[in-house]
Every structure is written in structure tokens, then in C-alpha cells.
């Protein structure tokens, strides 16, 4: 999901709707994996930070924030996702 988000952002094609859809898809995937026992509740809660960051990015798009600021925010999301994947390797698939 983050790869798709990054691609859209780098091409300056990210829309509010696309970012919101990615955040919603991530929410559904995370809930499904938590409910099935594929990921722990701790991993689920940690990954929620990434989903929230994507929602913030959607708001940034909607309010016309400068593209360079959105790139900075996305890079922070990506760094946080990498840290989560270090602690919870099973999250690599969801956060990729």
C-alpha cells in the first residue's frame, strides 16, 4: 500500500479520494488480520499510526499543502513503517 501511495505522490497524482481509499483499505486489511490471528493486537495498534498518517496526507492533499511538505510527511510515514516492520515482521506485507 505504501508503495502505491509513494508512486502516486511522486508522480503528483495523489488525490484526496485515492489517499482515503488506501487508508480505508489498510484499516480493513489490518482488522481482518487481527481478527484472524495473523497479527497481534500490538502490531494492529502500531500499524494504526500508519493508517492515521495516510489520513493526514489525504487532508494535506485536500487543503492544498505544498507538495514538498507532503513528501516530507510521507517519508516520515515510511520510516515509521520500517520501524514497525522491524518489531513486527509479519506487518511487512500489509505495510509494503
Regions found by a protein language model. Give the residues of each.
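Short terminal alpha-helical segments
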Residues: 1-34
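Helix-centric, low-specificity signal for extended rod-like, repetitive segments
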Residues: 4-5, 27, 44, 66, ...
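Generic structural signal for well-ordered, non-transmembrane alpha-helical segments
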Residues: 13, 17, 24, 48, ...
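Long, amphipathic, charge-rich alpha-helical segments that form helical bundles/coiled-coils
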Residues: 40-64
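Amphipathic alpha-helical binding modules
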Residues: 62-96
Amino acid at each position: 500500500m505504501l508503495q502505491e501511495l509513494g508512486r502516486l505522490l511522486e508522480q503528483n497524482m495523489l488525490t484526496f479520494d485515492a489517499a482515503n481509499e488506501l487508508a480505508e483499505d489498510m484499516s480493513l486489511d489490518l482488522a481482518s488480520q487481527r481478527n484472524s490471528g495473523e497479527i497481534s493486537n500490538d502490531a494492529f495498534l502500531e500499524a494504526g499510526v500508519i493508517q492515521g498518517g495516510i489520513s493526514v496526507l489525504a487532508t494535506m492533499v485536500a487543503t492544498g499543502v505544498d507538495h514538498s511538505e507532503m513528501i516530507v510527511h510521507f517519508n516520515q510515514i515510511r520510516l515509521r513503517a520500517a520501524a514497525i516492520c522491524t518489531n513486527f515482521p509479519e506487518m511487512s506485507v500489509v505495510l509494503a
